[in-house]
Structure formats: structure tokens, C-alpha cells
Amino acid sequence: MTELQRVIKYLAIAFAIVLAVSIVFGIIGGIGMIFGLGKDGNDMLLEESIDINVSQAITSLDIEVEAAELKIVEGDSFSLSSNIKDLRVNEKNGVLSISQKHKNVTKIGIHTSKAGEIVLTVPSGVSFDKVEIDARAGDINISALVANKVSFDFGAGKVSIDHIEVTDWADIDTGAGMLAIGDGSIKNLDLDLGVGKTVLKASLVGRSDIDCGVGATELKLLGNREDYTLIVNSGIGSISIDGDYANGNSTFGNGANVVNIDGGVGSIDITFEND
């Protein structure tokens, strides 16, 4: 791919994301104003969060959030609370499924000031087989998560994960906003970034692919530099590895853990931190 082709590619990505968001909210607003469809967002919410019964034999999570704040916190046992009236909760074969029936929007398609909230408490030290989160809009805060496999599809909002451990594979896609991972270990990471800032501090085990979009990316790789092989393509932005800039297509190191980085539009800063 030539330099001009890379420029066109990443500018097209940025434009497509902005255009898609504008179209979605434009359609929602137009339908609401013309036909008067949709409830007031506050009618979809309770005055206070209520507790929802869940079993203690949960092995996987499947969460779909339309427009709400999602929190996953540590505690002594599994518990779930929410102020969303039409929240759907189902358990089957150890899989806890949580989804929203309606979006929290007004008749003109703008989110209300009163946000929906979902709080899932997970016992400290529990390990899931698979965790799937599909969040279209809203902030996500996860204190700690351990799983064999994770599949995250984040839309618009801020995502903060304090600690994460993935032992098999992880597939993470972001839209517009910020992604911050504070600590952990991730095996075979496939990270596809959209528009916004990303800060990732973790050990990356196996083979990882990071496709950067538009914005600044900070990778703080836990372990020694000798543990990694970095294969980088700077795109039309800049890549810094421990303060040294990499241009074009380059390979650094010969460690067992391979990280393939495709630069986008913006800066990528890679550093190493010993445990």
C-alpha cells in the first residue's frame, strides 16, 4: 500500500464513523419529530435501581447495551441491579444474558440527562469461559475481569478496565471515545481501534494484532523488551518505541510474543515495564 493509499484509507475511516453516527441520530430524530414516536427517556427508567435475582452458577456473560452505563464490579457473590424498566435478563446453560429492550432517548432522538445504569457484581477471583459485551453508547467501567475468551464491541463512550486476564483470545473493537486498560495479561489480542484515545497497559501473550484508527495510542507492554517481537507499519502517523521513532515497515526484537501494529492517523507510543 502506497503512502497516498494509506492517507485515503484512514481519512475514509474517520469520515465513515462520523457520517454513520450522524445518520443514525438524524434518522432517530426525524422519525420522532415527524411521527411523534418513542417514549420520553425518563419513562423507561425507574426512580431507583432495583435488585434482579441471578444464580451463582454463571460461567459466561452475554451483555448487550443500547444506551446506558455498564459497571462490572467485584464482590462476594453474583448480583445484578438496574434502573432500566425493560431490561431483559436470562440464564441458560450457565450463560447470563443481559440486554436492553429500548434505547434511552427522547422524542427528538437525544439522550436524556437521566442515564440508565446496569451494575453487575462478580465474585472476586471468578473466571469465565467467555464474556461478550456489545455496547452501542454509554460509559463502561470494569474493575476486574478474568476469562478464557472475550469479545468486546464498543460504540461511543468511555471504556475503563482496571484489570483484565484473558487466557485464550480477545477480540476488541472500538468506535468513538476512549479505551483505557490499566493492568493485566491478554493472549492473542485482536484490537481494532476507531476514533479516540487508547491507553493499554498489559502483557500481550502469543500473537496480537493492533489496527490503529484515528487518535493517540499508548501501549505499555508489561515484561522485558526481549519478550516481544514488534512488527510495525507507521501509517501516516508516528510510532515511538522506548523513545526511538520507527518509520515505514519495521521489525524490532525476536521475542516469543509477537505484536503486529498497523498505524493509523495519530501517534503511537510504545514502552516496556517490568512486573
Regions found by a protein language model. Name each.
Residues 6, 88, 101-103, 136, ...:
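Arginine residue identity/basic-tract feature
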Residues 106-108:
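Membrane-embedded segments
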Residues 111, 161-164, 168-275:
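Short, surface-exposed interaction patches in beta-rich subdomains
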Residues 6-9, 13, 35, 129, ...:
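Polar/charged alpha-helical tracts
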